[in-house]
Amino acid sequence: MSEKHPGPLVVEGKLSDAERMKRESNYLRGTIAEDLNDGLTGGFKGDNFLLIRFHGMYQQDDRDIRAERAEQKLEPRHAMLLRCRLPGGVITTKQWQVIDKFAADNTIYGSIRLTNRQTFQFHGILKKNVKPVHQMLHSVGLDALATANDMNRNVLCTSNPYESQLHSEAYEWAKKISEHLLPRTRAYAEIWLDQEKVATTDEEPILGQTYLPRKFKTTVVIPPQNDIDLHANDMSFVAIAENGKLVGFNLLVGGGLSIEHGNKKTYARTASEFGFLPLEHTLAVAEAVVTTQRDWGNRTDRKNAKTKYTLERVGLETFKAEVERRAGITFEPIRPYEFTGRGDRIGWVKGIDDNWHLTLFIENGRILDYPGRPLKSGLLEIAKIHQGEFRITANQNLIVASVPESQKMKVEKLALDYGLMNAVSPQRENSMACVSFPTCPLAMAEAERFLPSFVDKVEAVMAKHGVGNEHIVLRVTGCPNGCGRAMLAEIGLVGKAPGRYNLHLGGNRIGSRIPRMYKENITEPAILASLDELIGRWAKEREAGEGFGDFTVRAGIIRPVLDPARDFWE
């Protein structure tokens, strides 16, 4: 990025149709309430198809049977995905029992899907159950407001830090930031909770009448763990502690991973450091970053609308100065911090007050009763006896948190009995995929259904070369939107077409470097052939402690992405 040649603060031109839709929606109401009563279709029509996203839902259909239904002259089997707002991924065991029952009784697939944004999703909610799901969430103190579309999404927070005391403080800030940046419209309460319409006019002092130009993602991260992948986010607060006490945050802005195949105006980007701020300025700074992006973000081209592009267009110093002006502060220099890893610590970890945390590996976050491994039933039984909380991690795993010593063996026995503590290889622990087929409308290639068998094959390659007990951060995402965060992996696969992927290499273990495309549009056998050769070289030629991604860069196999706006596509 060149500070010498900044672009315009505001992009002039014809606004995208999404801007019209938001402006005409009457603060996100549209005609959703009327549409709910239309029994002629299982989906939402017109603008409502997009407006429901502001209410935490996506309209999907089962793509496995789409063609078959079309032949039968039937509309696609529409069903909604609903994503809960759950700052920091913390959910009580009482809440868990209620959502478990809803998934079993009222969804097509009967599963709960943990996401890498520390929340859970229901897939396969029929239109008749859409209002009941919101009312169920409300009954246990939860909601789905602002978990999709052009708002500040679910706020992440490091799940299982080495400093347990810091978690409670950081988590409280994640909740405060989430609440502060929520939309103020009463549309959600009116439509889903049957709350009375109030005569006063809606106002959106932070988000504005047309909300943000694009999705906006926020994290609170506690070093040395980068489990939440801060560089995938628009705004990250890095916790800085003195003597075990939180004193403030380093602010990083402008990360983001989504691209469009072949569109060189799009690129993945790591976040930029702005500076340190004391705790008392946190909410003002969060608001200032969001409102600057609200006012300066590109509303003419949604492919170029995220904060990372705004930052590149206007220049880092210009954006930073505007945030300082709006927040009424001057950033202090960045305080020292370091990341050493981003995987979850599977198994028992002792926390403060003699309590224990049990991190359970949930492959791809899909909670279901599998043959011989009834995971969903096991978690329900643990929820019944555990008085504490569960924490959903950004690696799609689940922590049974704050277990007293007296309960530890009971919880462990249940986890063992239900297959929740089966041995897992380091490679499988460090592999992740997005949902993709059959429910995601954007999917170009398999991801969640592809990953388990693909990991088996990668493990065989690693064992062949004598590195079977080690790991490489592996991510698969079904399309270039990048929900699987492949653009921060050492090996990243990005779906291009059924059975075909772009292979990216050169990220690192701590998630601070964007990988570059190594081969384009290749099949699984071709991917494995490349990995066989490269993992073999890594095993023989690496330096002590050198990760696979760092090796591919040092050995000249791949050039590092140093300035994504300029060299991502080179």
From Swiss-Prot:
Per its record, the protein catalyses: hydrogen sulfide + 3 NADP(+) + 3 H2O = sulfite + 3 NADPH + 4 H(+)
Q: What is its EC number?
A: 1.8.1.2
The UniProt similarity line reads: Belongs to the nitrite and sulfite reductase 4Fe-4S domain family.
The annotation note on the cofactor reads:
Binds 1 siroheme per subunit.
Described function: Component of the sulfite reductase complex that catalyzes the 6-electron reduction of sulfite to sulfide. This is one of several activities required for the biosynthesis of L-cysteine from sulfate.
Q: Which cofactor does it need?
A: siroheme; [4Fe-4S] cluster
Q: Could you confirm whether the keyword Nucleus appears in this record?
A: no
Q: Which amino acids does the record list as binding siroheme?
A: C483
- Which pathway does this polypeptide act in? Sulfur metabolism; hydrogen sulfide biosynthesis; hydrogen sulfide from sulfite (NADPH route): step 1/1
Record-listed [4Fe-4S] cluster binding positions: C434, C440, C479, C483
Q: Which GO terms describe its biological process?
A: cysteine biosynthetic process; hydrogen sulfide biosynthetic process; sulfate assimilation
Q: Record's InterPro entries?
A: CysI, NiRdtase/SiRdtase_haem-b_fer, Nit/Sulf_reduc_fer-like_dom_sf, NO2/SO3_Rdtase_4Fe4S_dom, NO2/SO3_Rdtase_4Fe4S_prot, NO2/SO3_Rdtase_4Fe4S_sf, NO2/SO3_Rdtase_FeS/sirohaem_BS
Q: Name one GO cellular component term.
A: sulfite reductase complex (NADPH)
NCBIfam families for this protein: CysI, PRK13504.1
Q: How does it assemble?
A: Alpha(8)-beta(8). The alpha component is a flavoprotein, the beta component is a hemoprotein.
Query: Keywords in UniProt for this one?
Result: 4Fe-4S, Amino-acid biosynthesis, Cysteine biosynthesis, Heme, Iron, Iron-sulfur, Metal-binding, NADP, Oxidoreductase
The protein's name is: Sulfite reductase [NADPH] hemoprotein beta-component
Per the record, a Pfam family? NIR_SIR
GO MF, one example = heme binding
Membrane-spanning regions, if any?
Answer: none
